[in-house]
Amino acid sequence: MDGIKKKMIAMKLEKENAMERAVQYEELLKKKEEEREKRESEIAELNTKMKQAQIDCDEVQETLQEQMNKLEETDKRATNAEAEVAAMTRRIRLLEEDLEVSSSRLTETLTKLEEASKTAEESERGRKDLEIRSIADDERLNQLEDQQKEAKYIAEDADRKYDEAARKLAIAEVDFKRAEARLEAAESKIVELEEELRVIGNNMKALEISEQESAQREESYEETIRDLTERLKAAEQRATEAERQVSKLQNEVDHLEDDLLAEKERYKALSGELDQTFAELTGY
């Protein structure tokens, strides 16, 4: 009887110990389950972060593509601007050549004008000489007339001298008319040269204005090129910053993937512990 009683007490103690272990295992199982749910929640949160990181990465890639397109467009504009500057440079060079030709023509015209002025001065001196000769002939004619009045006996000689004086006077008048014609031609030539000089002066002023406008356009093109260069540098900086952001996001994605892999390993280990716990409970 004592043996049965002891055995029953031992069985009762063993039952109590088993119940206590069952309670402990249930609490342990509950903790493991809570930990598993927590890990699953963390994994879900990590998946959400990974999706958001992927979305951010896609947006950054789109932004990078847009920046690359803008950079390409900026390069095209810069190329076009350089072509325009080259064209303006060629045009300025041609204008400079035209200006040199015009200057040469102006020099030739001034030389011709100076020669015409000298010719006009010579014609004026000739005209004055003719006038002096004409006055002298008139005085001589008067003298002959006085001599004719004073000495009729030498009338024939006086008539001859008179005829000679008249002939010289006619020659002088013809020379005078020729001198006047040459003077008028010289004056007309001077007027023509002055008109040509005025036209050349106007052309030179027009060339100077065109050159100033070309210089202004060239300055505008240089300013545009500087602006495009600054915009290109800004685009390159933005592209570099975008690449840095992409690299940073890629590192974050890599870290998240590593964390996810570690969580999966922990979840796998936790599942193994739970399976082992269930096996131990089932064994009891």
UniProtKB/Swiss-Prot annotation:
**What PROSITE patterns does its record include?**
TROPOMYOSIN
Check the record and name the Pfam families matching this protein: Tropomyosin (PF00261)
Coiled coil regions in record = 1-284
- What is the UniProt domain comment for this protein? The molecule is in a coiled coil structure that is formed by 2 polypeptide chains. The sequence exhibits a prominent seven-residues periodicity.
Q: What does this protein do?
A: Tropomyosin, in association with the troponin complex, plays a central role in the calcium dependent regulation of muscle contraction.
Q: Which PANTHER family match?
A: TROPOMYOSIN
Q: What is this protein called?
A: Tropomyosin
Specify the species. Answer: Schistosoma haematobium
